[in-house]
């Protein structure tokens, strides 16, 4: 079983300027990471954290859909042990009734293709460090579509399949590939959802624990734990319940 302790390791987090991503940066520092590359399209909100940890936090501007920026960040971060693919987006809107392809394409570009670009760029880097780990922040909606977010669900389903494919392909280089499937988390993206929400910190804590134990599929909050339990009992019933949420 592949495992990895964060202490003295180098971590790169995408979408780290707020929410779950920022919690990953803070938790990695708390657990003794040697260095954290905190990346986002705008890293301004992390300036104080970087100033307080000048030897351990490196801020890098990154749009994961921009191949040139991905390549530049990979060139600047050749010492990474753990890649956390956290950057994501949701546009909402029904499929037929909305009749608007643009937000669905945006979701797929960021949540699937952007994640893939980062994995391709950093797989050789973590290999050179002994295998390392790639962590993909996905969603329970990638396991069964939610009718109020069909494009987001489809993009996260693609991310789920990508994670499985990466796990198989990178096993020979001893890279631990983890899929994380949160339910509603207390972030800006989920603020409109009428559910109890777990904290971003709890997601980061669960993921770093999973790295240490080699857990490949992480359900980091009570909602996601119960959701996957019901999915395993009766997937069709869950599908119908999710469809009623439109």
Predicted feature residues:
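Active-site helix of classical SDR
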Residues: 119, 155
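Conserved glycine-rich cofactor-binding loop
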Residues: 17-18
């Amino acid at each position: 079983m592949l495992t990895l302790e964060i202490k003295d390791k180098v971590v790169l987090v995408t979408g780290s300027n707020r929410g779950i991503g920022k919690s990953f940066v803070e938790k990695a520092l708390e657990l003794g990471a040697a260095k954290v590359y905190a990346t986002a399209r705008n890293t301004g909100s992390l300036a104080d954290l970087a100033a307080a940890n000048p030897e351990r936090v490196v801020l890098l501007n990154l749009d994961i859909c921009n191949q040139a920026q991905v390549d530049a960040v990979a060139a600047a971060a050749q010492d990474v042990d753990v890649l956390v693919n956290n950057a994501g987006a949701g546009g909402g809107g029904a499929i037929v009734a909305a009749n608007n392809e643009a937000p669905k394409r945006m979701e797929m570009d960021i949540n699937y293709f952007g994640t893939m670009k980062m994995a391709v760029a950093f797989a050789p880097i973590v290999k050179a460090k002994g295998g390392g780990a790639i962590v993909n922040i996905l969603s329970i909606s990638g396991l069964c579509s939610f009718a109020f977010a069909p494009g987001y669900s489809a993009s996260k389903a693609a991310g789920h399949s990508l994670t499985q494919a990466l796990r198989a392909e990178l096993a020979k280089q001893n890279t631990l590939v983890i899929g994380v499937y949160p339910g509603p988390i207390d972030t800006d993206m989920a603020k409109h959802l009428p559910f109890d929400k777990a904290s971003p910190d709890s997601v980061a804590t669960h993921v770093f624990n999973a790295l240490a134990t080699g857990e490949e599929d992480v359900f980091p909050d009570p909602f996601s734990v119960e959701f996957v339990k019901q999915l395993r009992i009766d997937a069709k019933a869950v599908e119908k319940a999710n469809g009623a949420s439109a």
